Amino acid sequence: MANKTIIITGATDGIGLEAAIKIAALGNQVGLVGRNPDKGIKAIERITSLTGNDKLNFFQADLSLISEINKLSEEIKNKYSKVDVLLNNAGGASKNKVITSEGLEQT
């Protein structure tokens, strides 16, 4: 699969970052989504260094907040004419019940 536009959530480390490296190495345009802009910049630098692919963008978003999901979707629509693949990788774990500022329980 090459020359596709692929969005990967949770793409700044772990499985998401490794997937982004492999997908970028195939020549795809990759949108990395994460909460931490510093980790996003480092991820893009690493992917570019390893693959030579510079068709990378970072989108900052906390996917536990609906308002940020809405903002992210607008940013992606404005950046790309189409998205071929959405790889939903973002996740987290907590031992305690966590309620977001929007009143949603994180799972």
Question: What would you call each of these model-derived segments?
Answer:
Residues 1-107:
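Rossmann-fold NAD(P)H-dependent dehydrogenase/reductase core
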